[in-house]
Amino acid sequence: MKKHAKVYYSENLVEQVNEFETSFEIKPLERGLGNTLGNALRRTVLSSIPSCAVFGVKIEGIKHEFTVLDDVIEDVVTILNNLKRVRFFYNPSVFSQNSIHVASFLGQKAGQIYARDIESHSGLKIVNPDLYIADVSKVGALKFELFITNGKGFVDFETNKKYVNEVISRLESQIEGSVLAVDSDFSPVLNANYQAVEINSASPIIEEKLNFSIKTDGSIFAKDALSQGAKILIAHLNLLADVENLNKFSADFFGDQEIKEEPIRRFSNSIDALDLSVRSLNALRRAQYYKISDIEKLSQDDFENIKNLGRKSVQEIMEKLQNYKNENKGEN
């Protein structure tokens, strides 16, 4: 009987753009398994990884999306389309299942409004702060609130409209207006592709290599998204493998507890966990620093040499980093 070859799994650093966009290589696989694994993983990471997204928007004074806003260049439909694209990195230990959180902009500035101007819950962090929202010519002309929940996959406007009606009594608000439902794209994975390549076509026994590339929205590392996708598949396959429990209902075959531990670990390892100002966070990301373990090694001089980090920002980072170390002393 032929022995199975040892399978080698690695990240392709040549094709890595950053921690959020990279590719992986698995080899050697038996002929046909490349497409089998690649297709299953791709579908799973695109549709089954939990995250959070906007499901409803309230704009002060607006009853429906065709209302005209004074002193704002964009119409309501355009603003809604921009707001539903705001992406959040969230802490699952704070953001419990089916809970609803609010992020808001209460008109405190005029000019061009970006996602970074939105104030959010402490368990949320906006990962695309440079997303353009609207151009306002007068302070106070535009005020809005975003209602955010967690979920998986894509939820359309009509489904969210029903959900808004169900939870309207739970929505706390500081402004007047109607809650307008929007589409929700919960998936933190923007793109996932695979290719199965024969690696020994001249041999009597042909084997394959699976190349799998993945790009996320910045709320989760690419390798963690792939890991979660694999765990979700394993949880389903374990159910099928348990032939002793045929015809029995398994209430926990998704292995929710195990799968949820991964985002929590991801939150604690990311610089997002330091709760830095948007300016400091963006400067570190542009310099390709994404993990706390990366910046722990830097001296004050190293921080001061990072572009767009002023003295106050350096002081903020070093203080927040020290606080983080003190709070996590003794943890591995």
Curated annotation (Swiss-Prot):
It catalyses: RNA(n) + a ribonucleoside 5'-triphosphate = RNA(n+1) + diphosphate. Residues 1-244 are annotated as: Alpha N-terminal domain (alpha-NTD). The keyword Transferase applies. It comes from the Bacteria. It is an enzyme of class 2 (transferase). Residues 259-332 are annotated as: Alpha C-terminal domain (alpha-CTD). One of its GO terms (biological process) is DNA-templated transcription. Its EC number is 2.7.7.6. Transmembrane segments: none annotated. The keyword Transferase applies. CDD domains: RNAP_alpha_NTD. Keywords: DNA-directed RNA polymerase, Nucleotidyltransferase, Transcription, Transferase. GO terms for molecular function: DNA binding; DNA-directed RNA polymerase activity; protein dimerization activity. GO terms for cellular component: cytoplasm; DNA-directed RNA polymerase complex. Belongs to the RNA polymerase alpha chain family. The N-terminal domain is essential for RNAP assembly and basal transcription, whereas the C-terminal domain is involved in interaction with transcriptional regulators and with upstream promoter elements. Homodimer. The RNAP catalytic core consists of 2 alpha, 1 beta, 1 beta' and 1 omega subunit. When a sigma factor is associated with the core the holoenzyme is formed, which can initiate transcription. DNA-dependent RNA polymerase catalyzes the transcription of DNA into RNA using the four ribonucleoside triphosphates as substrates. NCBIfam families: PRK05182.2-5, rpoA. This is DNA-directed RNA polymerase subunit alpha. It comes from Mesomycoplasma hyopneumoniae (strain 7448).
